[in-house]
Amino acid sequence: MNENQAIINIETTGIDPHKNHIYLINIFTIDRYYNFYSKNNESEEKIIKSAYKILQNKQIISFSEFDIKFINTKLIIYTEFDVINNCIYLQKLIRNYYNSQLSSLKAKDLAANLFDINIDDKSKSVKLYKKISKSNRISDELIEFSKTSMNFKIKLYNYMRKFFEENCAKFDVYSNFVRYLLYDIKKIKNNLEISLITDNKMEIDAMYESTQIKSQGMFITLCLSLHEGYIEDDFVECTMTSMDNNYNLINNYYPLVINGEFIYDNIKELVKYTLTEIFNE
């Protein structure tokens, strides 16, 4: 972790940012730990503005997209600040490499399975919040709950940093090695959008055959068109279809999505091949 990053944890009274509110924000930076508590709806705006002053120029590390989407909705409601968009979501990273090994990717289950940390159910923290709303005093239980939740996120971040060091792939750009991991995959109509997280900022805007590659900060995105078809049960014969013609699948075609499920090993090989072809020409 460096001085330009911050790990964030929030607790809310529900899942709808228009109806519910944030009552706790924890921020962990390289040299400080911040706690912001809201005892009622009226003080929510104050803690959000205070937290934003710390976060505005940093890369935010969050467990999932929920926290950032919730905060961004509140920023739009209360302020004219820019929304937070420089983020790393730990759940996305772990999904690509441990999805088949873990029965659940929920924070509570990951905390228990990976670190033997017990994160109480969210409903318990909401009950604790309702108590302090009446008493006007932050309870020790709520403070401990937030510390445990943040401790899990810090451990998961360090866990994935170690995983990056041990498992990252590499490609060469102008005699410099760039290390990366698969970060996110989205299927948008007949296109596949593949995001990589790297260990370095770079500027890339290139095309390789039908694949477009662009970079933004520490992220690289590959966008390619998918051919749709069907695969026999034994995966030996496959017919690819387009609007104009039908043709048989040849040996160097690899399925990337089957029945809506991403084939991660094939996607990783495609990324490796594409990057090598582009930058080693």
Regions found by a protein language model. Give the residues of each.
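Conserved DEDDh/DEDDy metal-dependent 3′-5′ exonuclease domain
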Residues: 31-106, 259-281
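Conserved RNase H-like, two-metal-ion catalytic cores of nucleic-acid enzymes
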Residues: 1-55, 196-202, 211-231, 235, ...
